UniProtKB/Swiss-Prot annotation:
GO molecular function: DNA binding; DNA-binding transcription factor activity, RNA polymerase II-specific; zinc ion binding
DNA-binding region: 20-47
Gene3D superfamilies, A to Z: Zn(2)-C6 fungal-type DNA-binding domain (4.10.240.10)
InterPro entries in the cross-refs: TF_fung, Transcription_factor_dom_fun, Zn2-C6_fun-type_DNA-bd_sf, Zn2Cys6_DnaBD
Role this protein plays: Transcription factor that regulates the expression of the gene cluster that mediates the biosynthesis of azaterrilone A and other azaphilones, a class of fungal metabolites characterized by a highly oxygenated pyrano-quinone bicyclic core and exhibiting a broad range of bioactivities.
Localization terms from the record: Nucleus
Ranges where the record places region Disordered: 77-130
One GO process term, biological-process aspect: DNA-templated transcription
GO cellular component: nucleus
Name this protein carries in UniProt: Transcription factor tazR
């Protein structure tokens, strides 16, 4: 049958206008007679025509058609690139494939308009959209393929492609609003493959972190993994950060989640640090860290600033250690500063003042946890500032908190009264046996004093100060180092087997000898004209460097994950000492190379060692050559 015969039938098939509500509800054909149609007149009801047409939804399969277009463009462009050997940066030509896709798009759009016209209605957008545009990428089509290897930056659709200006972003979906039948709430991210990309993994040993660390969903861990991480914490983290009572922790962890409060932050910080020290948890390490950081930020925003819980300070402490070891030193240093301010806000430096918290009726285990949290932050303050030679935050002279109790008494919650740090430093040289944690605190106190002495020396030289003040202060520190430092080393070195199994003992022994080197390097910079004093101290410093080398050989027996994480600090001091002398005395070169090799080995799991190597490389451009020689 010819089209001329069909045309009148098609046009007269349905009257102009909209069907009334009664006919639409009964699904009857409305004759559209006004004011009352035939159906309503026969039923005796009021005829109410529907004057507002409901907007039409998207056509079925439209999104699949859009995806197939992009895939066709990718295949076409990749085929042309393989055939012609063109560069990836060229723009794709508009070829037959592109015309075919345009025809498909136009026919699809025309089909929508024809159907609307047949129903007697036209969407408002169709008046100005006679010819719909084709989705044309603003970048090369191999760039679309590269979409699978790049993550969003700041906005969901902005991408930085290889070989382009990173400051200029492109939007692959910038023209989607031109399609009238596109769903209004389309989220194109649902069609972008969610894969780990170079921007979301470690780059040059450092995390490229997202800018938004807010907590959007719960980071779910299986219960078995949580238990494994908790026990891994007490096995590998607690030996160098002994601030939690194991029995009290598991009792608090058994409470319902709704009653834990800041304990949730502490748990995630513990698990984050434990995941770093367990190779089986590397796949969750970064995600767990990001979630923990966001959890802490969210908790602090809702926290009452006058009474922060102790768990928050402990979580901040663990997170700062993790960032120093696994993210980068600067980020960890800044996080440690926030932890120190929180410690000061809680007044943990004066726990044992008269009528203080120690006399408030709180259990010994809880008070001791607070003491140990403060002393761990105090030690961390010395650890991190020995690297960059920055001023200390926690002042030794205002501390009114007793030294930690022995580990056995702490875990069994048996009250033991210990000395104050000032009493210990001012007492006689006949020291009783102290715990490894207390010994480390004493050694780091001496190191902090030597660091302040070095900084004060630089200021005095800038202002033309008299060297006599420097000599008096230097001799006083040397006397403390010879008495307290030597007594501590002798005390913790009685049992060599414990020194091998306890990372705190091994680190404290190395740190005590490194303090001797720090004091010696300060003397060289401050008393360059006093050869007699320098030569006398040179012998003691050389002996200390040899002892560090001897202790360094035991690191391999501990394993990567049981070495004290701040062990690179004494190693870098020893390497700097040998580096300044190997040119005059070749006997120091093996010592220097051994320190470099140890730092390089530790850098596999510890970014602080990598930071120390970078510091040595800045002062000695030939260090790479030295490391190559030491490996051969």
């Amino acid at each position: 049958m010819s089209p001329s015969l069909n045309e009148p039938e098609r046009l007269n098939r349905q009257a102009q206008g909209l069907a009334c509500n009664e006919c639409r509800a009964r699904k009857l054909r409305c004759d559209r007679v006004r004011p009352t149609c035939g159906t309503c007149e026969s039923l005796g009801v009021t005829c109410t025509p529907n004057s507002v047409r409901q907007p039409r939804g998207p056509r079925k399969g439209y999104l699949k058609t859009l995806q197939s277009r992009i895939s066709a463009l990718e295949r076409q462009w990749n085929g042309q690139q393989k055939a012609a050997g063109g560069s990836p940066g060229e723009s794709p030509p508009c070829s037959e494939g592109g015309q075919t896709l345009r025809a498909v798009s136009e026919s699809t759009s025309d089909g929508v308009h024809d159907e609307d016209h047949a129903n007697g209605a036209r969407p408002p957008s169709s008046q100005s959209s006679i010819e719909q545009p084709i989705l044309q990428p603003t970048v090369s089509l191999d760039g679309i393929s590269a979409l699978h290897g790049f993550a969003p930056v700041n906005s969901p659709f902005a991408f930085a492609l290889p070989g382009t200006d990173p400051s200029k972003t492109v939007d692959l979906f910038s023209h989607m609003e031109c399609f009238p039948s596109m769903p209004t709430k389309l989220d194109p991210r649902a069609y972008v493959p969610q894969q780990l990309t170079p921007n979301s993994t470690m780059s040059n040993g450092q995390f490229d972190l997202p800018t938004d660390l807010s907590v959007t969903s719960e980071f779910q861990l299986p219960e078995l993994m949580k238990a494994d991480l908790s026990h891994l914490y007490f096995d590998r983290v607690h030996p160098f950060a002994p601030i939690l009572n194991k029995r009290r922790y598991f009792a608090r962890a058994a409470r319902p989640v709704s009653e834990q409060g800041a304990m949730t932050c502490l748990q995630h910080a513990m698990w984050t640090l434990a995941a770093w020290l367990g190779s089986q948890f590397k796949h969750i390490q970064k995600d767990l860290y990001i979630y923990t950081r966001g959890l802490l930020e969210k908790w602090e925003l809702n926290m009452h600033p006058g009474n922060p819980p102790i768990e928050l300070a402990q979580a901040r402490l663990f997170l700062a250690i993790y960032e120093i070891m696994q993210v980068n030193y600067e980020r960890g240093w800044l996080s440690a500063g926030r932890c120190f301010r929180l410690i000061q806000l809680m007044k943990l430096h004066e726990i044992d003042v008269p009528d203080g918290i120690s006399e408030s009726g709180i259990s010994f285990g809880e008070i001791e946890e607070r003491r140990r949290t403060f002393w761990m932050a105090y030690s961390l303050d010395r650890f991190i500032n020995l690297i960059n030679k920055m001023p200390l935050t926690l002042n030794e002279q205002v501390i009114f908190t007793r030294l930690p109790a022995p580990e056995g008494a702490f875990q069994r919650e048996r009250p033991v009264q210990t000395q104050f740090l000032s009493e210990f430093m001012a007492g006689d040289d006949d020291l009783q046996i102290v715990s490894p944690f207390s010994a480390c605190i004493v050694v780091m106190t001496i190191s902090g004093r030597c660091l302040s002495h070095q900084q004060q020396c630089m200021v005095e030289r800038a202002y033309g100060g008299m060297p006599q003040d420097f000599i008096t202060r230097h001799q006083w520190l040397e006397g403390i180092l010879m008495s307290k430092g030597k007594a501590i080393v002798d005390c913790i070195s009685n049992d060599l087997d414990d020194e091998l199994t306890d990372p705190m003992l091994l680190f404290t022994n190395m740190a005590a000898h490194a303090t001797t080197l720090l004091l010696g390097m300060t003397m060289q910079t401050g008393l360059c004209n006093y050869e007699s004093l320098i030569s006398g101290f040179e012998e003691r410093a050389t002996e200390a460097a040899q002892k560090i080398l001897h202790l360094c050989q035991r690191l391999n027996e501990c394993g990567y994950f049981k070495v004290h994480p701040f062990t690179p600090i004494p190693l870098v001091f020893c390497a700097e000492w040998a580096q300044g002398r190997k040119n005059q005395n070749p006997a120091f070169e093996p010592l220097h190379n051994s320190m470099l090799c140890s730092l390089r080995d530790l850098s596999v799991v510890n970014m602080l060692a990598e930071t120390c190597l970078a510091r040595l490389n800045d002062s000695n451009p030939q260090m790479e050559t030295d490391m190559s020689k030491s490996q051969s």
